Amino acid sequence: MTEQRPLTIALVAGETSGDILGAGLIRALKERVPNARFVGVAGPRMQAEGCEAWYEMEELAVMGIVEVLGRLRRLLHIRADLTKRFGELKPDVFVGIDAPDFNITLEGNLKKQGVKTIHYVSPSVWAWRQKRVFKIGRATDLVLAFLPFEKAFYDKYNVPCRFIGHTMADAMPLDPDKNGARDVLGIPYDAHCLALLPGSRGAEVEMLSADFLKTAQLLRQTYPDLEIVVPLVNAKRREQFERIKAEVAPDLAVHLLDGMGREAMVASDAALLASGTAALECMLAKCPMVVGYRMKPFTFWLAKRLVKTEYVSLPNLLAGRELVKELLQEECEPQKLAAALLPLLANGKTSHAMHDTFRELHQQIRCNADEQAAQAVLELAQ
């Protein structure tokens, strides 16, 4: 009598965020199926949870068109090799974690060979290049989506999708400790506090920092006690921001932070930030915000034609209305940004109403995503 093979799950993560998701999924699966086997492309966190790495995650983690072109032969070789090896292994389920340009084609290749496939983290198909939904539908048996409006989009096209909630919503408390965050950052409890988050990419920091600093200067005229915290993702962005500040606002006192974006949001009465995941994190930190964003004119012209959503920030997309002010392109200028932030710093009716809605939205997407993802994998494996 042959021994039954353990549940075998193949996974591919292409960057750090995917490694974190993959590790959480593996942990949740091991609790239910302790002898399960995990193989694929993994980062250090997934490997620490017991995933066998056929390739290191860094092999896939390339950013930008030039870098991708330089590595294209290697990436295509890895994908062909994984198609062959996973095809021979016949895992019970393949889970492609984010990295859609790499994973969706791989999922399609494996599905043709009879392997059940899951795409974990929906690409922004609801916002632009919507026709990708048909390719995703052909390539996957199931999409795992973080946000409810993503599931609604897939339902419209009859692509199987499961809303599992957002891991960030699971990780952050419903009622953050504002005073605790202020203790960590050295901000007095009774001071007004503004967080400036000009983005994580060099182009964003270059485009937004000057106007964000000028906005803070205007706000300091109304609130002389205003504490300004500026978390920056790495040394390169900090150096870039310091250079711009020396040109634009050399005398403006600010607290520059290495990382610590979440602490800055929790500690602040209001935040001015670039769009993106930071807006979702700020919502979960219950920090009232204004979104300011600018890009090169041609890029903006193109985006207006390609993007199919009414709003750019995730809090507004979740709420289905303009919950937070979005000031884009020419609108993203100091006078308008300051005018939008003033009522939030006053900490009155406007910011309290925003805080309450943020809490409701947090509860909507706080669904224990790791457990939900593990359940979906096991159901498909049966």
Curated annotation (Swiss-Prot):
NCBIfam families, per the entry: lpxB
Protein's organism: Escherichia coli (strain SMS-3-5 / SECEC)
Catalytic activity entry: 2-N,3-O-bis[(3R)-3-hydroxytetradecanoyl]-alpha-D-glucosaminyl 1-phosphate + UDP-2-N,3-O-bis[(3R)-3-hydroxytetradecanoyl]-alpha-D-glucosamine = lipid A disaccharide (E. coli) + UDP + H(+); a lipid X + a UDP-2-N,3-O-bis[(3R)-3-hydroxyacyl]-alpha-D-glucosamine = a lipid A disaccharide + UDP + H(+)
Function in brief: Condensation of UDP-2,3-diacylglucosamine and 2,3-diacylglucosamine-1-phosphate to form lipid A disaccharide, a precursor of lipid A, a phosphorylated glycolipid that anchors the lipopolysaccharide to the outer membrane of the cell.
One Pfam short name: LpxB
Presence of the UniProt keyword Zinc-finger in the record: no
Protein's recorded name: Lipid-A-disaccharide synthase
EC number of this enzyme: 2.4.1.182
Keyword Lipid biosynthesis: yes
Cellular component terms per the entry's GO annotation: membrane
